[in-house]
Amino acid sequence: MVALKSVVVSNPSTAQALSELARAVDDIDVEPRLVCVFYDADHDDSLIFGFVRKRFVDAALLGGTSCGGVMSEAGLGGAGSIGLLLIADADGDYGSAAVRLGPDASDRAEQALHAALAAADCAGELPELIWIYQAPAREEAVIAGLRRVVGDRCPIIGGSSADNSVVGNWRQLGLEGPMTDGLVVAVLFSSGGIGFAFQNGYEPSGASGIVTRVGHVPQNGSGVIAKQSARQITAIDGEPAAEVYNRWTGGVLSEKIHAGGSILAETTMYPLGIDTGKIDGVTHYRLVHPDQIGKDGALSTFAAVEEGTRIYCMRGDRTRLIQRAGKVAAAAAQALPGGSQNLAGGLIVYCGGCMLAVGEQMPQVAAAVSKSLNDMPFMGCFTFGEQGWVLDRNVHGNLMISAVAFGR
């Protein structure tokens, strides 16, 4: 029997927040096998780590900073919030491990997965799910390392830790304590079954083109997949990428097209999409978020793109971003053995960029997810990169929603 409990407190003082959390945990009768903890980046990681390790000595641990706090079935935690998701499953097996990524992220990811499997006493076995939380920037390399062990036979789902203002103040939390350039891997062998979904809240605008040149191609496990692939698009259809993209968006970058610089805010509603295939006749897209205009009109992105790929200009709005979160959660619940009637709770990864764009309407997102999960316990974090499984392949994307549903 699987049981989930969520606890959220909101207080700018880490010490006071943990005192509130302690009182709430005292009222919960559960012995978790896995503890997920996410929190506003302004909190003190060392205090949070000390609290969790003292309270849940034998549990696997995964967590880190989340942009602007967390959400749960109780609503939006908001600034200063800390959230715990406690997963109890006496008949299941869970393990976690954490590593600093170092110069070779793929190798380190592979090592972390083997360590997590050993911690679950399941060395050499295929997990039902791999859940990851990591520092942004080398997600493709991390997935490549994990795939050396499990291929695409096992879903890899998770997020990239975030801060509150995109200044690099993100951290990750595992059994060894807080990290700034780390990866936490959890392996789940649930006795109640797991459902999952990985989607976005955008649609094609109609414009598309071929990536004809990419920028510097990283080496040594830091992003090369197969073809020439990089996080900088230099040319689309033989023209400077930023100029083409600006035309596609109707000129939203006109003021920055020559000066260059950050374009995160301008592009949140106009990401690039890559066709990942059809499900029930509906095309699904992996999103790529352009974040900078560089030299000679190059576009820097938060996910790698291969030369020769057709990319689509996507468009979104607040309403779609609010509604889609609930739909993704519902899809994960329906994917459970026994469907949503077998639901014990869930874990939601919602892009921090989308969260910032939705703004004061974010309580509606939490409400939509809660309704789709039948008001069962869930925890939602806000990330700067999302990982998920779509059409039999594990991928990294931006501005995405990743949902995991746990069966009883």
Segments and roles (model prediction):
Residues 1-55, 59-60, 64-359, 363-372, ...:
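Small-residue-enriched flexible segments
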Residues 375:
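Short beta-strand/loop segments at the ligand-binding rim of alpha/beta enzyme cores
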